[in-house]
Regions:
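Conserved histidines in hydrophobic membrane contexts and catalytic metal-binding motifs
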Residues: 34
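Catalytic core of pol beta-like nucleotidyltransferases
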Residues: 1-31, 39-45, 56-102
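Structural signature of FAD isoalloxazine-binding scaffolds in flavoprotein oxidoreductases
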Residues: 53
Length: 102
């Protein structure tokens, strides 16, 4: 069943929300949003979690990679972390439209 617009209902992400946000802050990331199958309510056991983040001042690509690894450890599944500017033009509008703030 699809999620309501702009609401996050996946039990895993809801349960781990505070820990996810704490990891993001520790790595200099802000404005965490979920997109892809988790945002659309179509996630299954093998789905990865797609996060859209903005890096704060002073944060580096190393921080982005470390955040990705820490999120994978926390959630127990593959995670992709991407900045809005890094989105391919072909999917950019769709991703920005479906992204749900964490």
């Amino acid at each position: 069943m699809p999620v309501a617009e702009n609401s996050l209902s996946d039990p895993l992400l809801v349960a781990k929300r505070q820990e996810i946000l704490a990891l993001a802050a520790r790595h200099g990331a802000r404005r965490l949003q979920v997109f892809g199958s988790f945002a659309r309510g179509e996630a299954h056991a093998a789905s990865d979690v797609d996060f859209l983040v903005e890096l704060g001042p002073g944060a580096t690509l190393i921080d982005l990679g470390s955040l990705q690894m820490d999120l994978q450890d926390l959630l127990g599944r593959k995670v992709d972390v991407v900045e809005p500017d890094a989105l391919h033009w072909f999917i950019r509008e769709r991703v920005l439209r479906e992204a749900i703030p964490l």
